[in-house]
Amino acid sequence: MSALLILALVGAAVAFPVDDDDKIVGGYTCRESSVPYQVSLNAGYHFCGGSLINDQWVVSAAHCYKYRIQVRLGEHNINVLEGNEQFVDSAKIIRHPNYNSWTLDNDIMLIKLASPVTLNARVASVPLPSSCAPAGTQCLISGWGNTLSNGVNNPDLLQCVDAPVLPQADCEASYPGDITNNMICVGFLEGGKDSCQGDSGGPVVCNGELQGIVSWGYGCAQPDAPGVYTKVCNYVDWIQNTIADN
């Protein structure tokens, strides 16, 4: 994977080969307000997703880092002002100290919002995991990624896909030598349904808890190439300590 990662980190989800775009494949348009923890990271344009974990902090992928970020919450159609959005600038952006941009190990970052958001039916936090999700756990992945394998069709409406956590042995067999203990695979070995990464930094929520962060993958919904996600259960202490210190 290392050589391929030279092509990565362009703000959208990391997906290889380059002729396969980031997108949700085999998914559906999320019901409005059904993913109230989903945020859009904006720098004059939508470039990544993230997850609201309390009224002033967002979790995303470290490879989504920019010096300044506006966090957009309460979004469904990201190209229309629907009246329920909250736009808040970042006050602090903190990447994991052991993030490796070459291997994408520890691909996680925290964003402190300049002011707390108002929590309501459209904007709500998602709990951190109380334990790691076992293989077979069903999860919801969401994002505004491109919907075409070739070409560009960025959806206005938030897209969702349902997929299971895969056994770690299957994950490692799909990407020999590239999977660390801080990564999980979610999807289908037969292909056909995949976030492909949807949008980098976006959520993987299983049984109501944030278990994954969209990180990288090879192609889109390809057989034996499931999506790879940051394993959030390994970072609960780091998240809580970082929030307490900032």
From Swiss-Prot:
E.C. designation(s): 3.4.21.4
PROSITE patterns registered for this protein in UniProt: TRYPSIN_DOM (PS50240), TRYPSIN_HIS (PS00134), TRYPSIN_SER (PS00135)
Site (Required for specificity): 194
Broad class of the protein's primary localization: secreted
GO biological process, alphabetically ordered: collagen catabolic process; digestion; proteolysis; response to acetaldehyde; response to caffeine; response to nicotine; response to nutrient
Signal peptide range: 1-15
Cofactors: Ca(2+)
Removed propeptide positions: 16-23
Tissue specificity field: Expressed in the pancreas, lung and kidney.
Top enzyme class: hydrolase
GO MF: calcium ion binding; serine-type endopeptidase activity
Keyword Calcium: yes
Cofactor binding remark: Binds 1 Ca(2+) ion per subunit.
Name of a matching Pfam family: Trypsin
Residue sites binding Ca(2+) per the record: 75, 77, 80, 85
Disulfides per UniProt: 30-160, 48-64, 132-233, 139-206, 171-185, 196-220
List of catalytic residues: 63, 107, 200
Superkingdom of source: Eukaryota
UniProt xrefs under InterPro entries: Peptidase_S1_PA (IPR009003), Peptidase_S1_PA_chymotrypsin (IPR043504), Peptidase_S1A (IPR001314), Serine_Proteases_S1 (IPR050127), Trypsin_dom (IPR001254), TRYPSIN_HIS (IPR018114), TRYPSIN_SER (IPR033116)
GO cellular component entries: collagen-containing extracellular matrix; extracellular region; extracellular space
Subcellular location: Secreted, Extracellular space
Sorted UniProt keywords: Calcium, Digestion, Disulfide bond, Hydrolase, Metal-binding, Protease, Secreted, Serine protease, Signal, Zymogen
Stretches assigned to the Peptidase S1 domain: 24-244
UniProt similarity note: Belongs to the peptidase S1 family.
Protein name stated in the entry: Anionic trypsin-2
